[in-house]
């Protein structure tokens, strides 16, 4: 994939993310103006112990806002990539841009409560949950690939690699069963084999972080090591916002997601600036 082709795809992704920002903002604003934010808990919480903790009371508004944060994060990341890496061919940034774009699909969660007010926006929660599981698998695998392929993958094969990751993620998601009757407090239907999927994503995320730390030590590059820790913050923020149903989760997850993404891009930019 040439730099020009990569930049075209990133611009398209940025436009889609901008569209999702506008759509999610409009949905949240509509519910706010109508005074129709969800008032009840749509289902059990991801962590039942949170019900008894005074810092994490259930807030449906926080759950809706958490979903709306993701496309804004994606748009900022893609804009940074276009500005700082417009003429730089970097394997890491190509995969990170793909991951950042896929994260914007988390905003589809807004359609679940919005669908109760606007019939045209009503989409099956199972379909939305399946699409979001796809973006979580795809983004995690892309970030692992961003460090693995730097050891030998050529820039011309990046397009095919991203496609294969997308195909694998789609195939995996279609094989996972969903029970439409199990809507949780974050407006998602929990998939079957939840524990297995959680362990799988956690292991892939940790492998990505560890791989960056190893590469940083091997190359004697402090910026690469810092990028690994930034990814750890990104994954932590992503996980927290994925289960977000309280204001404490919204604040903590948002801070980790944005600070991790910013630090990762900044450190990779510094690394290539001195090459």
What are the residue ranges of the model-derived segments?
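Alpha-helical transmembrane segments in multipass membrane proteins, preferentially the mid-helix core
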Residues: 75-80, 140-151, 172-182, 194-222, ...
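Hydrophobic alpha-helical transmembrane segments of multi-pass membrane proteins
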Residues: 45-46, 69-80, 94-116, 169-174, ...
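Alpha-helical transmembrane segments of polytopic membrane proteins
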Residues: 13-15, 62-71, 127-140, 190-205, ...
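Membrane-interfacial loop-to-transmembrane alpha-helix junctions, especially the N-terminal start
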Residues: 87-102, 155-166, 216-229, 248, ...
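Hydrophobic transmembrane alpha-helical segments in integral membrane proteins
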Residues: 6-18, 27-30, 48-71
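The cytoplasmic-loop to transmembrane-helix boundary for the fourth helix
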Residues: 11-19, 147-176
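Internal transmembrane alpha-helix with an interfacial aromatic "cap," most often the third helix
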Residues: 72-96, 104-161
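C-terminal transmembrane-bundle signature of multipass membrane proteins
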Residues: 19-32, 36, 199-275
